[in-house]
UniProtKB/Swiss-Prot annotation:
Residues 388-401 have a biased composition (Low complexity). It comes from the Eukaryota. GO terms for molecular function: DNA-binding transcription factor activity, RNA polymerase II-specific; RNA polymerase II cis-regulatory region sequence-specific DNA binding; zinc ion binding. GO terms for cellular component: nucleus. Sequence-specific DNA-binding transcription factor. Binds to two specific DNA sites located in the promoter region of HOXA4. Keywords: Activator, DNA-binding, Metal-binding, Nucleus, Repeat, Transcription, Transcription regulation, Zinc, Zinc-finger. One of its GO terms (biological process) is embryonic organ development. This is Early growth response protein 2b. The lineage of its organism: Eukaryota, Metazoa, Chordata, Craniata, Vertebrata. A zinc finger (C2H2-type) spans 299-323, 329-351, 357-379. Residues 374-384 have a biased composition (Basic residues).
């Protein structure tokens, strides 16, 4: 809805019901300046005469002759100093049109009369028929109801802001934003002192709980705002991340906690749970002692008939795959499976043709380091043979010289 006014009114709609001061308009000036259609009544209790307020008369006379009466109004009207002897009538036309021109409401033309408290509603702007005279009490009740309804509708739009005693009431505490249900900040303080053993399996957790280290998203966003006031925050949430899991913890998790007889195997590697098969190719020297002492090899093979012991758990895991036949590494080219990752690496070189290992004597290249080592032994044997043959040749020549000297001396 848009409002069009014919006269500029510097006060709001709520200010029309206030009485005007007598010093603003005098009776003599009103008699000369107001149009003939506006009548000043001296008697408050008398009947009002008929008012002919056509659109053409109001639009023509009120817009031209009323310019001489434009005064600077203050925000509030002053109360009259003395008693009023005479009253006058002030008329204005407010045409309220809807947003679409086709939906014009004929009741949108409102005539507001202040000082005399006279209200009048014309049925249509095109009608110029004289209106019947009505009692002042009826107009007063109609105007009071209309103004009270309009003022109540516009108070929620133009209501002044609530007064604040200080700046602290305008800006809320940042901690109040964190008290919502979408961002809870009450977390139990985590502890990283020591891993808790499990009573059932005796295993230690190797992945710590990082929930206490990372802050909630709402709290992290609030700390990044420079406009907010700083607030106290507990220092427990700024804990340093826990260190990496030590090797002993990983070893205990893989093979179980150490017992009185040394490290024990997990339940998955026990002979009754794994289908351990004997090795098809036995060791070349089964009774040959190892260079590493027994106490430094605490991981024995659980398979029956296998006396192998290892100093590292990953070596034992790799060895157990020989008994179980597990081959987790697969070639993507020929789909062949291998039990060790290094075997898969060397196998892929057969497809690519890569030979990174070269012989130091002849320059021949090999795909595996053990092949180069085996080939190098051939050169070493040949070198030993040459050195042995040369040494035998020198010794035989020396013997021949010695025998010739002895024979010549005997002849003499």
């Amino acid at each position: 809805m848009t409002a069009k006014t014919l006269e500029k009114a510097p006060v709001s709609l709520g200010g029309f019901v206030h009485p005007l001061a007598d010093s603003i308009y005098s009776v003599d000036e009103l008699g000369t300046t107001l149009p003939a259609s506006v009548t000043i009544y001296n008697d408050l209790g008398g009947h009002y005469e008929q008012i002919n307020a056509g659109d053409g008369l109001i639009n023509g006379d009120m817009s031209t002759e009323k310019r001489a009466l434009d005064l600077a109004y203050s925000s509030t009207f002053a109360q009259p100093a003395g008693p009023r002897n005479q009253t006058f009538t002030y008329m204005g036309k407010f045409s309220i049109d809807s947003q679409y021109p086709g939906n014009w409401n004929p009741e949108g033309v409102i005539n507001i009369v202040s000082a005399g408290i006279l209200g009048m509603t014309q049925p249509s702007s095109a009608s110029s028929s004289p209106a019947s005279s009505v009692s002042p009490s009826h107009f007063s009740s109609t105007l009071s109801c209309t103004m009270a309804q309009n003022q109540a509708d516009m108070e929620h739009i133009y209501s002044p802001p609530p007064p604040y005693s200080g700046c602290g009431e305008v800006y809320q505490d940042p901690s109040a934003f964190l008290s919502t249900s979408t961002c809870p900040i009450s977390y139990p303080p985590p502890s990283y002192s020591s891993p808790k053993p499990n009573a059932d399996s005796g295993l230690f957790p190797i992945i710590p709980d990082y929930a206490g280290f990372f802050q909630p998203p709402c709290q992290r966003d609030m700390q990044s705002m420079p406009d907010r006031k700083p607030f106290s925050c507990p220092l427990d949430s700024f804990k340093l991340p826990p260190p990496l899991t030590p090797l002993n913890t990983i070893r205990n998790f893989t093979l179980g906690g150490p017992g009185p007889d040394g490290p024990r195997l997990p339940t998955a590697y026990t002979p009754q749970n794994l289908p351990l098969r004997p090795i098809l190719r036995p060791r070349k020297y089964p009774n040959r002692p190892s260079k590493t002492p027994v106490h430094e090899r605490p991981y024995p093979c659980p398979a029956e008939g296998c006396d192998r012991r290892f100093s590292r758990s990953d070596e034992l895991t790799r060895h157990i795959r020989i008994h179980t036949g597990h081959k987790p590494f697969q070639c993507r080219i020929c789909m062949r499976n291998f039990s060790r990752s290094d075997h898969l690496t060397t196998h892929i070189r057969t497809h690519t043709g890569e030979k990174p290992f070269a012989c130091d004597f002849c320059g021949r290249k090999f795909a595996r380091s053990d092949e180069r080592k085996r080939h190098t032994k051939i050169h070493l044997r040949q070198k030993e043979r040459k050195s042995s043959s040369s040494s035998t040749g020198v010794s035989s020549s020396e013997r021949g010289v010695a025998t010739s000297i002895c024979s010549s001396s005997s002849n003499q």
